[in-house]
Regions:
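Hydrophobic alpha-helical segments in the permease module
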Residues: 1, 14-36
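Juxtamembrane "helix exit" motif at the C-terminal ends of alpha-helical transmembrane segments
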Residues: 1-8
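ABC-type nucleotide-binding domain
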Residues: 69-315
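Two-component histidine kinase transmitter core
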Residues: 57-58, 124
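Conserved E/DxxT/N motif and adjacent residues on the DHp alpha2 helix
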Residues: 53, 60, 169
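Pre-NBD coupling/linker segments of ABC/ABC-like ATPases
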Residues: 58-69, 296
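Cytosolic ends of transmembrane helices, especially the final helix of ABC transmembrane type-1 domains
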Residues: 26-54
Length: 315
């Protein structure tokens, strides 16, 4: 409207008048472009800092010699660990996971249960003490060699943006299609896969977002079955599933445990670990109690209190 009067009076030509009218649009477009560029720059700097953080990490050390042991007993000897300096998660944790037995770990949230699995898989290095597999300390063994001996089924399942078949094949790249399908039958996922339009060639989407939580969990178990490692780590595999999927996953885990393996299982409900060969009860970063279900109930300690509380809730 400011330019309308001069234009109407003939003192402003039509081209200039149109340019003035369009000026706010140009300014808005420029402001939007600047905002997009600044956002891109901010994201670029975040990515740059993350990359530099990885590059500045100490180079991984350890022998690349295969980890060959007669047994797969796991021993923690006075192990300490902190994610943040000065805030210990594990404090002189000492225990043994017997070879080819099922050991369950229970305890309060944040007591260090998942940390134990991460240290066994060598996702992190212990800040003190010694972790051994088959009597051989893994402190100076490359993480890659340790992971060759380990299969892990975690709460948060990572899947590649690939087909179901190839996601499972990542566990053992030379596996045949028949071996993959056999593993899926054991993991209770063959039936739902075959119901899909493309079957085993169905894309999972980025990080498996085209599948439900229970389906992702069973595919992860199929990978563990296919890999057939001597050590199996299970981290609260049924923690966030509905009843139907939880039952299917529990059956898949039961099939997985048929083979003689050294198994360490974390569970949020005690009922699924009461038949374990050994139960470790975590408390304040240490092993507060250990024993079988019956032995721990007889002690009348932390485990017995947790069991009684769970029974009251389910009654």
């Amino acid at each position: 409207w400011t330019a309308y009067a001069p234009w109407a009076a003939g003192t402003l030509n039509t081209v200039d008048y149109l340019l003035i009218c369009m000026l706010p649009l140009f300014c808005a477009k420029l402001a939007n472009s600047i905002f997009v560029d600044l956002t891109s720059y901010k994201n670029l700097m975040i990515s740059k800092n993350k990359i530099l953080g990885v590059m500045n990490e100490p180079e991984e050390t350890g022998s690349m010699e295969p980890l060959q042991t007669a047994t797969h007993e796991i021993t923690f000897d006075s192990v300490d660990f902190s994610y943040v300096p000065g805030e210990p998660v594990l404090k002189h944790a000492t225990f043994t996971v017997p070879d080819q037995k099922l050991t369950a770990i229970v305890g309060d949230s944040g007591s260090g249960k998942s940390t134990i699995l991460n240290l066994i898989a060598k996702y992190y290095e212990a800040t003190g003490g010694t972790i051994s597999i088959g009597g051989k300390p893994i402190n100076h063994v490359a993480a890659e060699r340790v992971l060759e001996q380990v299969s892990m089924v975690d709460q948060d399942i990572f899947l590649f943006d690939d087909t179901i078949r190839d996601n499972i094949r990542h566990a053992r790249p030379n596996a045949t299609d028949t071996e993959i399908e056999d593993a899926c039958r054991e993991a209770n996922c063959d039936s739902f896969i075959r119901k899909m339009e493309k079957g085993y060639d169905t894309p999972t989407g980025e990080n498996g977002n085209l599948l439900s939580g229970g389906e992702r969990q069973r595919i992860s178990i199929a990978r563990a079955i296919l890999k057939n490692s001597p050590i199996l780590l299970l981290d609260e595999a049924t923690a966030s599933l509905d009843i139907e999927n939880e039952l299917a996953v529990k059956q898949a885990i039961a099939n997985l445990l048929k083979e003689k393996k050294t198994v360490v299982m974390i569970a949020h409900t005690l009922s699924i670990v009461k038949n374990a060969d050994q139960i470790l009860v975590m408390g304040d970063g240490r092993i507060a109690e250990s024993g079988t279900h019956e032995e721990l109930l007889a002690k009348g300690g932390k485990y017995a209190a947790m069991w009684n509380a769970e029974q009251k809730i389910s009654a």
